[in-house]
Structure formats: structure tokens, C-alpha cells
UniProtKB/Swiss-Prot annotation:
Subunit structure: The cytochrome bc1 complex contains 11 subunits: 3 respiratory subunits (MT-CYB, CYC1 and UQCRFS1), 2 core proteins (UQCRC1 and UQCRC2) and 6 low-molecular weight proteins (UQCRH/QCR6, UQCRB/QCR7, UQCRQ/QCR8, UQCR10/QCR9, UQCR11/QCR10 and a cleavage product of UQCRFS1). This cytochrome bc1 complex then forms a dimer.
Binding site for heme b b566: H97, H196
Organism in which the protein naturally occurs: Philantomba monticola (Blue duiker)
Cofactor field: heme b
Pfam families, per database record: Cytochrom_B_C (PF00032), Cytochrome_B (PF00033)
Membrane-spanning intervals of the chain: 33-53, 77-98, 113-133, 178-198, 226-246, 288-308, 320-340, 347-367
Entry's family note: Belongs to the cytochrome b family.
Coiled-coil residue spans: none
Name of the protein described by the UniProt record: Cytochrome b
A cellular component term, taken from the record's GO annotations: mitochondrial inner membrane
Location in the cell: Mitochondrion inner membrane
Alphabetized InterPro entries for the sequence: Cyt_b/b6_C, Cyt_b/b6_C_sf, Cyt_b/b6_N, Cytb/b6-like_sf, Cytochrome_b, Cytochrome_b_C_euk/bac, Cytochrome_b_N_euk/bac, Di-haem_cyt_TM
Molecular function terms, GO-annotated: metal ion binding; ubiquinol-cytochrome-c reductase activity
Amino acid sequence: MTNIQKTHPLMKIVNNAFVDLPAPSNISSWWNFGSLLGICLILQILTGLFLAMHYTADTTTAFSSVTHICRDVNYGWIIRYMHANGASMFFICLFMHVGRGLYYGSYAFMETWNIGVILLFATMATAFMGYVLPWGQMSFWGATVITNLLSAIPYIGTNLVEWIWGGFSVDKATLTRFFAFHFIFPFIIAALAMVHLLFLHETGSNNPTGISSDADKIPFHPYYTIKDILGALLLILALMILVLFSPDLLGDPDNYTPANPLNTPPHIKPEWYFLFAYAILRSIPNKLGGVLALVLSILILVLMPLLHTSKQRSMMFRPISQCLFWILVADLLTLTWIGGQPVEHPYIIIGQLASIMYFLLILVLMPVASTIENNLLKW
């Protein structure tokens, strides 16, 4: 009798990706985040779909429609807060996933890595547009400030910003198009994620040692399916604790005030997961310079395979690189804290030093440390 899961064209793809996939026997929980990101994406698409059924993308009614969802729609409050905090969980998983890739040298799979960087950009764009939709004060002013950054592009900047706005300021046209893009982007992300997996399955997964695991593979199911289910349960537990106990912990109180173009909030800041990039942007006094630093702070990930000077792929056996990696993590946490602080002494200088440190660590110190470690191997 033929096994349908190995013969049916569709089932065969699923089987080869999630059941009979040969996986390294030693991958740790740091390899759980890929599946967790998939769960986050599905959760966001589903909650987003139900929110879209009740939301109106019009400047006069957007804020009221979100209030209506929370007060009058059956379980609307939990759907709204799962969506808002689901974005936070999404970015926590994203940062962990990228951090894992940096630590264990997963960027050696260049196609997979580059698609991942595109996915990161797409997710950030989606989250930004989603933050504009409730049309609170921070939504409006966040949209104004961030889109305005494009005016720093020489010659075409101003025209580009007005084209994106659909007018001379952030208004009804902007909100409508942001809603349209925010709806379509997660499906583009899902398609890109499939390409990401396609490229990953061409090479197979990396593992903590960074050594080829071809000699010791185990089937994905049941070993890693059960491991992923544990990860998923912990993710959902963390999300539901956040949603049910402190749903507004990561939000901004200003967003409970309807958007008012005549009243600027004292401190305009994005959601917490963009604060590190926002701090880098603010640390440069020049507008164009700040925008370039902002883009490069993420785009620098593309250079990781080129900056890898070590003879070993993983950092598992490289203590100096490990030390620098954790300094980089601490630096990013510092930038996140600074991004949420007002622009005044001593925060300005701390932000500037942390920004310099960020680029210095990635572009200079880590490649140099790798070279030193290579020479230490000869001892």
C-alpha cells in the first residue's frame, strides 16, 4: 500500500518539510524561534482579520472603531490586545532568531540569511503601518515623523514624502493606504517565509557546534515537533499573561488620545521594538546622516558573511567573540532604553556612544577578535 503522505504532490512537500526532514541531533532551544515566528505570523493574520471586520480606515471614525471593538464587539478586547501584544512577541522572537543566527554563524547560508533580512525589513514596515491605524496621538505623530525622514533624500525627498502621504500632511489618504498595505504585507511575509524555508532546506539546519551534522541526523517528527509544541505553549503562555494582566504595559498612553494635528506630544517615540534604531537615528545631528545610520543599523546584517574572518563557523568555542557578542546585546539594550528617553543631557551623549559602539563592534572589533582567535589556535 502506497503511503499518501509520500506520494501526494502537496502532502509530499509538507512531509519533506515537517515530518521526514533530516535534522541535526543537537540543535538547542535557540532553533525553536523559526517555528515560533510562524505561529506569531498565523496568530497576527487571524486576529488582524477579525479586527479588520470591525475597523474603519477613516480619520473621523478610526479611533472610535478601535474603541468600539474593545467595548462592544464580542471578545473584541482580547482580539485587539492579542494583536497588539502579539506584535511584541513577534519582535522578541525575531530578535532572538537573528541573535541566534549571529552567534552560531547561520549567516553562512547566504540565501536564507538575505531572505531573512528582507523578512525583518518587511515585518518592521508592517508593524509601523499597523501602529498608525488606531489614529491616536502617537499613531499620527509617529507616522508624521518617520515618513518625514524620507524628505532627507536629496532632490526627490519632498516629492516622495508627499506622494506617500497622498497630500501635504498625514491625513485620510495616508491612513487608507496604510491600512491597505498593513493588510497585504503579512501575506507577502508568509510567502517570503516559505522561500526562506525553501533555501534553508537546500542546505539543512546549522547546529550549535557549526560543524557539519550530515553524519548524525534524526527525523524532524517526532523529536522536533514535540520540542516546537513546548516552545509554542510557552510563547502562548507569555502572550496571554501579557494580554490578560497588563495589556498596556508595552503601549504608549498618548495613543489613548485621539490624533490631533494641532497638538504635538512632548516625547514622540515608536513602539519599544524600534527604539534601538530610533536612538541611532537621533544620535546623529544631521538629518540625512541619521536616516542612513537608521537604515544601515539593520542593513549591516547583510554584511555579516563578509565580516566573518574566523576559521570556525560558530562562536561556541570562541570566548573573545562570545564576550563581544554579549557586549553587543547589552549595547542594543542600552540603545533601546535611550530611544525612550527625552533628548537631553546625559541621554544624548550615552546614545551617541552606544551608536558608535554598535557599528564599531560589528564592523571592527568582532572581525579583529576572530582573527586573534585564529592565531590563538596555533599555540
